[in-house]
Amino acid sequence: MGEKIIIFDTTLRDGEQALQASLTTKKKLKIALSLEEMGIDIIEAGFPISSPGDFKSVETISKEFKSSIICSLARCVEKDIDIAAEAMRFAKHFRIHIFLGTSPLHVKSKLKKNFSEIIDMAIFAIKKAKRYTBDIEFSCEDAGRTPINQLCYIVENVIKAGATTINIPDTVGFTIPYEFNQIIKSLYNKVPNIDKVILSVHCHNGLGMATANSITAIQAGARQIEXTMNGMGERAGNTALEEVIIAIKLKKNNLNLHTNIKHKKIYKTRKLISEICNTVIPSNKAIIGTNAFSHSSGIHQDGILKNRKNYEIITPKSIGLKPIKLNLTSRSGRAAVKYHMTEMGYDEKLYKLDILYNSFLKLADRKGQVFDYELESLAFIDQKENTTEHFRLKKFNVQHQSTGITISSIELYCGKKIKTANTRTKKGLVNSIYITLNKITNLPIYLKNIQLITQKKPINIIISIKVQIEYKKRQFYGIGNSKDIVESTAQAMIHILNNIWKANKVNILLKNIKT
């Protein structure tokens, strides 16, 4: 199993700094408990001196932790340290994390000090923190741009003063892996008392190398990695914890290292943090992006169907995800189409694969991704009916009043009939349309997700709305495009209603075949 790498999460402190608005104490507690459940060793809950809200959050979280160690940030300022300790007074065990700029740039232009004064400030702060706890971390801010001899000198002195963890941050993401590896090795070679502490690293992603720098640091001897879930953080972000955790897991035989993280909790935690912080995870984000386990190439899909290891280095299940189906696009082959039909329970005797595949390609070329319900419509409904829209928008009117009430009226073609419904709600424009359409169709549909995308055209701005609706435990997706957000939303939902109508028609047809 090898030595353990301590995982230090700073999502609630360094990660939150990237958000436009601070999180409430309730939201921070929810994230903190999810991180603890995941097995994070140390959780930096905030910077208590920075605001009353941060103080309250740290104080609240400190009462709840059962296994994770809570940590608070403090400058080399007496009051900072006092407040940090006070905020964590209810914790069974806590860490004070002191930081100070050590690079010539920070020392001269930011702190307006000389290096000797910096040493004195650091020693004073550590001795002050020792009055409250034996668990003291000292960070050499901007260590990546600090001359190695100066870095070694301050590290040696803060260890003598009582620091138990020394953190080496690449604050602006300036170093590359070889350079960062050499910094860590130099500290082990030149600092005589380095064996008395845990050496930690805190990498930023300025050059896109935060994860690589963190891994090369533990190869050089560092035993704590600091980072954030989803790589949240100021500027280009921090080391993404999920990336280093999985890298250590996959390369455990080469690294001879391990963590105590419960890997199957990763996706649940990622999703919670993304939702609470209202941050969008790039679809191609390693480990946790929506495309991380997606395969659209026909060659890749064929390989995946034969053995998922052909194109996947980890399984979705290993991070807490259900098995993910193959995306159906114009690049998909017959094998993928047949696989999807089989997964839906359709015997090949019920349809003609060659005919279905040709129809599928035409649809995929026109719209991109094809969903299962569209595939079964192609298989079992004739072309004329497939292109006929049962539901069509005749007229709509939506008004949002200053009182917060939205009034909507929709006239909808339902086959040859026209149906009308009206709604008054305080739930906003989108929900007013959803509620009104629900009244007209009387279908048990549930709005699960909505995404707005603006497209700038030479003259106009086109608003695209993507909607996800659940119907009878099945997910349906629709898209609408218009200059008007209300019309885009209505189009997207009506697109879905037509697909639901076709899905129901397929069910009726198949029941008739069986009987």
UniProtKB/Swiss-Prot annotation:
Binding site for Mn(2+): 14, 202, 204, 238
Enzyme class (EC, first level): transferase
Keywords: Amino-acid biosynthesis, Branched-chain amino acid biosynthesis, Cytoplasm, Leucine biosynthesis, Manganese, Metal-binding, Transferase
Entry-linked Pfam families: HCS_D2, HMGL-like, LeuA_dimer
SUPFAM superfamilies per the UniProt record, alphabetical: Aldolase
Region named Regulatory domain: 392-515
Pathway: Amino-acid biosynthesis; L-leucine biosynthesis; L-leucine from 3-methyl-2-oxobutanoate: step 1/4
Membrane-spanning ranges: none
Localization per Swiss-Prot or TrEMBL: Cytoplasm
GO cellular component: cytosol
EC number(s) on file: 2.3.3.13
Any one GO molecular-function label of the UniProt entry: metal ion binding
GO aspect biological process, one term: L-leucine biosynthetic process
Cofactor: Mn(2+)
Known catalytic reactions: 3-methyl-2-oxobutanoate + acetyl-CoA + H2O = (2S)-2-isopropylmalate + CoA + H(+)
Domain (Pyruvate carboxyltransferase) ranges: 5-267
InterPro entries: 2-IPM_HCS-like (IPR050073), 2-isopropylmalate_synth_dimer (IPR013709), AIPM/Hcit_synth_CS (IPR002034), Aldolase_TIM (IPR013785), LeuA/HCS_post-cat (IPR054691), LeuA_bact_synth (IPR005671), PYR_CT (IPR000891)
Subunit composition and interactions: Homodimer.
Biological function: Catalyzes the condensation of the acetyl group of acetyl-CoA with 3-methyl-2-oxobutanoate (2-ketoisovalerate) to form 3-carboxy-3-hydroxy-4-methylpentanoate (2-isopropylmalate).
Family affiliation: Belongs to the alpha-IPM synthase/homocitrate synthase family. LeuA type 1 subfamily.
Record's protein name: 2-isopropylmalate synthase
Name of the gene: leuA
